[in-house]
């Protein structure tokens, strides 16, 4: 499954894995998964977290290692982002629910994920997605960026 991923995708997923793997031991625990999900405004129960881990925990050790994570991501990509998942993701970023993601909102979410970005990096991310040049990202622009990944 993971062998169908490009090198770019693999390195992108490695970066995402590192965001989850807070202590850097090469495994994602339910605690680490919960921390990241809560920072994104989700509120999973312990049982839900355990289910998510069990779903991809091939060796049954109760954690997700990088190869297991890659398989999960490859599976998720095959399901391709449903409209509902994209709307949900957009809502996570659009803190004030005004239909736009501002630089401040983007910075806030990225900081919660443990990504320390400079103002330049945040502005660059906005510029890349901001088709109509209004300095923020609307839903259509967000979908374009997410589908291009």
From Swiss-Prot:
Write out the residues that bind Ca(2+) 3: 94, 96, 98, 105
Q: Which residues bind Ca(2+) 1?
A: 21, 23, 25, 27, 32
The residues the record assigns to binding Ca(2+) 4 are 130, 132, 134, 136, 141
Q: Give the matching Pfam families.
A: EF-hand_7 (PF13499)
Q: Which UniProt keywords apply?
A: Calcium, Cell membrane, Membrane, Metal-binding, Nucleus, Repeat
Q: Where in the cell is it found?
A: Cell membrane; Nucleus
Q: Which family does it belong to?
A: Belongs to the calmodulin family.
Misc. remarks from the entry:
This protein has four functional calcium-binding sites.
Role of this protein = Calmodulin mediates the control of a large number of enzymes, ion channels and other proteins by Ca(2+). Among the enzymes to be stimulated by the calmodulin-Ca(2+) complex are a number of protein kinases and phosphatases. Activates MPK8 in vitro. Required during nonhost resistance (NHR) to the nonadapted fungal pathogens Phakopsora pachyrhizi and Blumeria graminis f.sp. hordei, probably via its Ca(2+)-dependent interaction with ABCG36.
Assembly mode: Interacts with MPK8. Binds to ABCG36 in a Ca(2+)-dependent manner.
* Name under which the protein is recorded: Calmodulin-7
What taxonomic lineage is listed for the species of origin?
A: Eukaryota, Viridiplantae, Streptophyta, Embryophyta, Tracheophyta
Q: What gene is this protein a product of?
A: CAM7
């Amino acid at each position: 499954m993971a062998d169908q991923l490009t090198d770019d995708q693999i390195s992108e997923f490695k970066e995402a894995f590192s965001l989850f793997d807070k202590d850097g031991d090469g495994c994602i625990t339910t605690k680490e998964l919960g921390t990241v999900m809560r920072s994104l405004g989700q509120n999973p129960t312990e049982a839900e977290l355990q289910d998510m881990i069990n779903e991809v925990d091939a060796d049954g050790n109760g954690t997700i290692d990088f190869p297991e994570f890659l398989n999960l991501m490859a599976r998720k990509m095959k399901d391709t982002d449903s409209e509902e998942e994209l709307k949900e993701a957009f809502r996570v970023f659009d803190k004030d629910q005004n239909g736009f993601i501002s630089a401040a909102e983007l910075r806030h979410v990225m900081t919660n994920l443990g990504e320390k970005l400079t103002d330049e990096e945040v502005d660059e991310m906005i510029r890349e997605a901001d088709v109509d040049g209004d300095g923020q990202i609307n839903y259509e622009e967000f979908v374009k960026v997410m589908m291009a990944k």
